[in-house]
Amino acid sequence: MKAEAAIVNLYSPGDTLSLHRDVSEECNRPLVSISLGCDAIFTCGLDDERVATLRLRSGDAVLMSGESRYAWHGVPKVLEGSCPDWMADWPGEQYQEWEGWMKGKRINLNVRQMFA
């Protein structure tokens, strides 16, 4: 995989990412999704019978490739209060007015290859 594009999403408790399929782009190339901050519930499935539900923690990465690139997937829940302590207190003294801001946030970074 050659990283050519990235999307950064910011979520708060109560935010969701509805089930969807990535059909607006060529899906034969892998996608890497990295989670930071609060934990989230991630659901992925090709049909009603083959569904996986995972708890994504800060620092987890998901690789979607092959058949999974065409799967329905989404984030029905961000888990409030699950941000690791070291990140919940970030950024610290230099930007003290922002201290604790990440405590209720989840950052998702999606990296993908766009061209052959």
Where are the model-predicted features located?
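Conserved double-stranded beta-helix
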Residues: 1-41
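Catalytic core of Fe(II)/2-oxoglutarate
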Residues: 38, 43-116
